């Protein structure tokens, strides 16, 4: 990135806007007036056009570079919703088979039937405000509909994956929280991913593409 990135670790900006969504876009003009608000993915061409309009309004003599020409890759098919794993956003989670036990190690049991777009936990997990931490025989089963499945994780260890009950792949996890690709496909498909975590791995957030 060749431009400044603002970090909001303490959620000061998030809370100042009483925001409940991610991603959320707030376009603000040169006078500090909020001119546009949008939630969720997509419609990036319209966003860019609005940004260019506000920049020109602020400085009509400034010559802007040509508009970007990037292929539109936002899925148009039905896609599983993003799901946070910590207890802070448990009300917005798509966990089935029981609720999280906050700030303690608890044993979970995955139901045999998981609706599309939902996930279930089994084994022992510690549930924190932003993440869940694998303790023993820790598994997440997620029934997805998407081209791609991603999970934000941290720690050092591995995830062993199954796809529709068959061995799929192993993902090595290392270091600070970042996005890992669990599944990718050219077309939108549904499937059941089984994710077995080694002890100490932390999982934060499922996203889909």
Which residues does each PLM region occupy?
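Non-globular targeting/processing and membrane-anchoring segments
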Residues: 45-209
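Thiol/disulfide oxidoreductase modules built on the thioredoxin-like
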Residues: 1-3, 7-50, 184
